[in-house]
UniProtKB/Swiss-Prot annotation:
Residues 1-22 are annotated as: Disordered. One of its GO terms (molecular function) is structural constituent of ribosome. GO terms for cellular component: large ribosomal subunit. The gene is rpmF2. The keyword Ribonucleoprotein applies. Residues 1-20 have a biased composition (Basic residues). This is Large ribosomal subunit protein bL32B. NCBIfam families: rpmF_bact. GO terms for biological process: translation. HAMAP family: Ribosomal_bL32 (MF_00340). It comes from Nocardia farcinica (strain IFM 10152). The keyword Transcription does not apply.
Length: 57
């Protein structure tokens, strides 16, 4: 594991950490019971099988 030779300043630490951002999931349009809905791509298969109720998303 890398060990820093010198202490990183608070400003540099916070600038580096600010680059880590969460982004919203990409939404895909899927038709369930004749009603088009936008849902996250990773949930499409479960919604089509009826494992997840799209009303609760």
């Amino acid at each position: 594991m890398a060990v820093p030779k010198r202490r990183m300043s608070r400003s540099n630490t916070r600038s580096r950490r600010s680059q880590w951002k969460a982004k919203a999931p990409d939404l895909v349009e899927v038709t369930v019971a004749g009603v088009p809905r936008k849902v996250p791509r990773r949930l499409v298969a479960a919604i089509r099988r009826g494992l997840i109720d799209p009303e609760r998303l």
